[in-house]
Amino acid sequence: TIYLGSLLAGLGCGSFYGSAYSLTSQNIPQAKKSFATAIVNSGSAVGSGLGMILSSYLVAQKGLPWQVMMYISAFMIICMLVAFQVIIRNHKEDMALIQPTVVDEKDNGAVKEKVPFKKLFAPHMLFAYILYFGTCYAYYMIVTWLPNFLSTERGFQGAAIGLSSSLVAFASIPGALFFSRLADKYMHKKVQFIVVLEFLATAMLLLTVQVSNATLLLIALIMYGFLGKLAVEPIIISWLGENAPKIGIGTTLGVFNFFGMMSSVIAPALTGKISDTTGSKVMGFYIAVVILLIGTILFMLVNLKKRGADSSNK
């Protein structure tokens, strides 16, 4: 039953972001899309942080049944379903804008559906997918295994586990809003923002596993949240929208999300296997660091090469 519930929860989570990004793309100007994506992602950060704190306090410290967290989650989901139904709806102006597009797509469906494989997996696109895989791999490994890592290998207990783990989520909110605003302001610098943030996040992730001092560990977690996935993801998505093939943008985003979701399956399972085999999750952290570092370097190199080619053509 719990596996079926997890499957249904995953389907819901996977379907939400595509719809949310579609709404923002329809209603938000190009110059503010990174910031809009950051706001959408901030909801995930708030939910993750509150979930970690409440579960540690109510279940681990107060001894309540774990099902209590499921009931709380179900209640909040129902509230948001009502809010979406009442507040977020298709207005007449939206439908007037959408209908001609739908008709045009029907008339030209054969052209719009086919994306050349060569363009879909061009080097700069492929390395963007790999970068996103590495970014999500590190994040989902942290989200899944950090509470257990803090408890079994760093001596944290009770509510301190959830509070410490939630620092990653809460620190990501100001990071996402701050860096997305900068990226929207300096739109031609998005690659530089992405590369610098990824390198810094990699360094913080490495520091997290290497330090034994609790204060330094918490600082590293806060900085990883501030600089990591939720901060850089809006900028990557904005960059992708500018560089993806204009024909079949939906297919491109689908491939991009596939790489990210694939990491959410591999990272928890692989780290768990490493923990069972070695008795420690440290190697799982190092693997995340290496994958993220490789993805960032590949993305940086292909964009440097692309920039050089564009300059020579001019």
Question: For each of these PLM feature ranges, what is it?
Answer:
Residues 40-91:
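Helix-loop-helix hairpin linking two adjacent transmembrane segments in secondary transporters
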Residues 5-46:
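Cytoplasmic helix-loop-helix junction between adjacent transmembrane helices
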Residues 177-188, 276:
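Helix-to-loop junctions at the C-terminal end of transmembrane segments
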Residues 94-127:
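Juxtamembrane intracellular "pre-TM" segments in multi-pass secondary transporters
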Residues 189-239:
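C-terminal transmembrane helical hairpin of 12-TM major facilitator-type secondary transporters
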Residues 241-280:
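A late C-terminal transmembrane helix in Major Facilitator Superfamily
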Residues 123-176, 237:
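Extracytoplasmic gate region of multi-pass secondary transporters
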Residues 35-53, 257-267:
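Glycine-rich segments within core transmembrane alpha-helices of 12-TM secondary carriers
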